[in-house]
UniProtKB/Swiss-Prot annotation:
Identification of the protein by name: ATP synthase subunit alpha
Keyword match Lyase: no
Molecular-function annotations in GO: ADP binding; ATP binding; proton-transporting ATP synthase activity, rotational mechanism
Catalytic activity line of the entry: ATP + H2O + 4 H(+)(in) = ADP + phosphate + 5 H(+)(out)
Primary location group: membrane
Keyword annotations from UniProtKB, A to Z: ATP synthesis, ATP-binding, Cell membrane, CF(1), Hydrogen ion transport, Ion transport, Membrane, Nucleotide-binding, Translocase, Transport
Required for activity, annotated site positions: 376
Gene of this entry: atpA
Lipid bilayer topology: Peripheral membrane protein
Subunit structure: F-type ATPases have 2 components, CF(1) - the catalytic core - and CF(0) - the membrane proton channel. CF(1) has five subunits: alpha(3), beta(3), gamma(1), delta(1), epsilon(1). CF(0) has three main subunits: a(1), b(2) and c(9-12). The alpha and beta chains form an alternating ring which encloses part of the gamma chain. CF(1) is attached to CF(0) by a central stalk formed by the gamma and epsilon chains, while a peripheral stalk is formed by the delta and b chains.
Principal EC category: translocase
InterPro entries hit by this protein: ATP_synth_asu-like_sf (IPR023366), ATP_synth_asu_C (IPR000793), ATP_synth_asu_C_sf (IPR038376), ATP_synth_F1_a_nt-bd_dom (IPR033732), ATP_synth_F1_asu (IPR005294), ATPase_a/bsu_AS (IPR020003), ATPase_F1/V1/A1_a/bsu_N (IPR004100), ATPase_F1/V1/A1_a/bsu_N_sf (IPR036121)
Amino acid sequence: MAVTAEDILSRLKASIQQPVGGDPTAVNVGTVASVGDGVARISGLRDVMASELLEFKQTKSGETVMGIALNLEKDNVAAVILGDYLEIEEGDLVRSTGKIISVPVGQELLGRVVDPLGRPLDGKGPISASKTREVERIAPGVIERKSVSQPVQTGILAIDALIPIGRGQRELIIGDRQTGKTAIAIDTIINQRGQGMVCVYVAIGQKRSKVAQTITTLEQNGAMDYTIVVNASASESAALQYIAPYSGCAIAEEVMEVGVTVDGNLVKDALIIYDDLSKHAVAYRQVSLLLRRPPGREAYPGDVFYLHSRLLERAARLSEVNGGGSITALPIIETQANDVSAYIPTNVISITDGQIFLESDLFYAGQRPALNVGISVSRVGSSAQTKAMKTVAGKMKLELAQFRELAAFAMFASDLDAGTKAQIERGQRLSELLKQPQYQPIALEDQVIILWVAGNGFLDDVPVARINDFKRDFWQFIHSSYAEVGRAIASEKVLSEATIASLRKAVTEFKQTASYK
């Protein structure tokens, strides 16, 4: 049978009208115009959102690398590459995903170590999280919040007594390198066992060995059961270091808004530590300069204040209508030669609700934690302090601040009146009392007991060198002979008349049996 032209034409029409493998979809594709130092300029991409996730297809290896569109210019898009950019070449295809960068969140992340994209780093297998959250999010509004009213017990006597932190607060930890900033944060995480808190530790630009040491410490103290570690170490790209705190905050927001289960209880309070935001600002400066954004003071871009304010404003205490959860943020800033008036420190001080200032001179003098009581402050934490702690710690901060001034003055004065001498000796005893070894948090009831003893003059005849011996032995005596005192303080959170009477009896009895000379 001969095939006619009409047959061929009808078959062609039929094949054209027949659908081919599903519905066709439009894909937004561009090409790499130039690449270097982790930044790619892309031509041909249309309809790209700011901070949109882009997919780079490497021609040589065929592998896919992700990037973020940060500069949307007239004829090209500048993107930072999240990963190995050395294999990306000019002419490689780039596809827009239509998604803003997201991170896995939820129950599955507890006890895990992840990178800022939620990829596991601990060798414990993949994370099967069913939910993701965008890393950038607008902070809760004023109406959605409520005032800070519940304490975060750090277990550090000096902080819980003098600079109390509340759930939903932003409290800056600031000081020179090697003054114990990370130690305070880790101690606080360790003390959250049984306190109904989930902790997120974000390491930005740290050495891998230091992060591994921190994780080991948390594991040894049983703290990884309720902790998530987000790590963008110094060897990672500046882009990954830049998004790390936002990823950690998104993970914490899931806890605040939805909650996770810890030891069979639903927990909606999160504690997040940013260690540290100085390195975060440096990473952002690097990214901005590579994107050719105009530099400002200290070569930081003009929006470096907004970089940290939009992050720290996401820490909040939500109202009961909105679930009543909270995020408490402890950002860390490293200063140079105790200079708190530098650009980044002043920015973060103005954003946060107070600062814990650690001084290298105090640290090397053996005062650890090396807390400078004079310029450390908590603007909202006192309203979250328990009544028992308020009762015993009320005048203590003023006494210590006055002692530091008097001690400096006394160095040049030979004759001191009896009142000044007594005040200096009392200050020395209080300073000694506040010394505390690392990774040994103190329970609230023990803190209240020893501060009541000090505040009522029972330490005035104890030599300064024996204060720590007295403290240790008295706690042991209370736990064995007057355990009901600690239980009453822990449950009632107040110092009742009966509790005070029992305390007075206990300390009198203890001082009759033990001698500290």
